[in-house]
């Protein structure tokens, strides 16, 4: 079986889910390719789309929230959105790519390719199975105007929400968000810390700011580090935000208990090493934390779907949060020093996560292709 996995460079989560699914397909001896849909457009289209997203959410996150709310209004109209028509323009190029490379199925971890695939189906240009994977704990605007064969959602409790938006319930499968097997693999905290060069026995707080280093990490770091006691450690991962990494290293260069990290491919290991994790409520990073079963503090969300992700986790005891940086730091400190609360949170995460989502989606695709 040969599968095309479509994504889009608007944040790291969609690409990470696509890569995790590719890893699962490869494990079962299937061929898989991850493709940024926008790379089929004009030169620099992918960079422009991804760059615009990064600029908006980093410089003016409230603007992204306003666009999300506008989408909530537009979705109520009885016609297709501008998002649909913008992505439909890539339909012919995608149809040619699928035909030329002889794929047996196509999966998308992003809304935009789902819009393109919908246009292709309407025009009779798509004859292979197509599956959409939702990577947020909410039915974001415009999923309802797509027409994929199946929709993989993160949790069974989200089926009513997606169905109420207009997606047929029989198409909704609560298989979870795919994450790399490394997040589900048992790991000794001491061994992982030794491998990462971290103290083996001291309580350790991990602060993550997402793949592009968003959020008020410098403020949270100040509040957290000022509360550390008795050799407690803080590891701060800045993602691709090199400016922030340099600033934090300058701020804490005299503190041996603070470790500033840039982009890393060892997130699963750092999560395994942590006693408490602080991260913004991205759908993918939150799922990785739940699968890893690490006590979780959700920090400031990008307004819109991340606000809903955080609400979903907090309401099920899978994370805690706070209204401002001081409150977030205090929530994490309190959680780290309360074994009973940590156990309860890990149990809630285990109950509500799907570590084998990639495997489940792989078997779904095998079934669809064989029919």
Regions found by a protein language model. Give the residues of each.
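Active-site and donor-binding regions of nucleotide-sugar-utilizing enzymes
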Residues: 12, 17, 73-166, 171-174, ...
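Conserved N-terminal ligand/cofactor-binding loop architecture of enzyme catalytic domains
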Residues: 20-95
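A nucleotide-sugar donor-handling region in carbohydrate enzymes
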Residues: 149-204, 208-211, 241-243
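Donor-nucleotide binding loops and adjacent catalytic segments primarily
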Residues: 190, 199-273
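Acidic donor-binding loop of glycosyltransferase active sites
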Residues: 272-282
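C-terminal "capping" alpha-helix adjacent to the active site of nucleotide-linked donor transferases
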Residues: 315-320, 324-340
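A short, well-ordered alpha-helix in the C-terminal region of glycosyltransferases
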Residues: 341-355
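C-terminal alpha-helical cap of glycosyltransferases
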Residues: 354-371
């Amino acid at each position: 079986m040969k599968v095309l996995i479509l994504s889009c460079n608007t944040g790291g989560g969609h690409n990470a889910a696509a890569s995790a699914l590719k890893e699962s397909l490869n494990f079962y001896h299937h061929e898989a390719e991850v493709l940024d849909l926008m790379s089929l457009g004009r030169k620099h289209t992918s960079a422009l789309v991804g760059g615009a997203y990064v600029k908006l959410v980093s410089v003016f996150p409230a603007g992204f929230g306003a666009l999300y709310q506008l989408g909530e209004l537009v979705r109520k109209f009885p016609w297709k959105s501008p998002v649909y028509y913008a992505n439909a323009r890539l339909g012919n190029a995608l149809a040619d790519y699928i035909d030329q490379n002889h794929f047996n199925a196509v999966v998308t971890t992003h809304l935009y390719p789902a819009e393109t695939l919908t246009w292709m189906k309407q025009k009779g240009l798509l004859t292979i199975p197509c599956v959409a994977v939702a990577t947020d704990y909410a039915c974001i605007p415009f999923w309802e105007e797509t027409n994929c064969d199946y929709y993989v959602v993160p949790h069974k409790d989200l089926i009513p929400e997606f169905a109420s938006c207009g997606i047929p319930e029989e198409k909704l499968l609560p298989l979870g968000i795919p994450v790399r097997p490394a997040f589900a693999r048992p790991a000794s905290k001491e061994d992982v810390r030794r491998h990462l060069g971290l103290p083996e026995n001291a309580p350790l707080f991990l602060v993550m700011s997402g793949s592009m280093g968003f959020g008020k990490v410098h403020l949270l770091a100040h509040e957290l580090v000022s509360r550390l006691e008795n050799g407690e450690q803080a590891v701060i991962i800045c993602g691709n935000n090199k400016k922030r990494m340099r600033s934090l290293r300058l701020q804490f260069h005299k503190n041996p208990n603070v470790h500033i990290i840039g982009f890393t491919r060892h997130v699963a290991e750092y999560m395994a090493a942590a006693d408490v994790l602080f991260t913004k409520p991205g759908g993918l990073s939150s799922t990785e934390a739940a699968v890893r079963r690490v006590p979780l503090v959700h920090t400031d969300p990008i307004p819109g779907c991340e606000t809903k992700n955080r609400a979903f986790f907090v309401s099920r005891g899978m994370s805690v949060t706070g209204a401002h940086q001081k409150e977030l730091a205090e929530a994490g400190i309190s959680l780290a020093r309360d074994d009973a609360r940590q156990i309860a949170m890990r149990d809630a995460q285990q109950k509500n996560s799907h570590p084998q989502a990639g495997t489940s989606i792989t078997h779904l695709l095998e079934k669809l292709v064989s029919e």
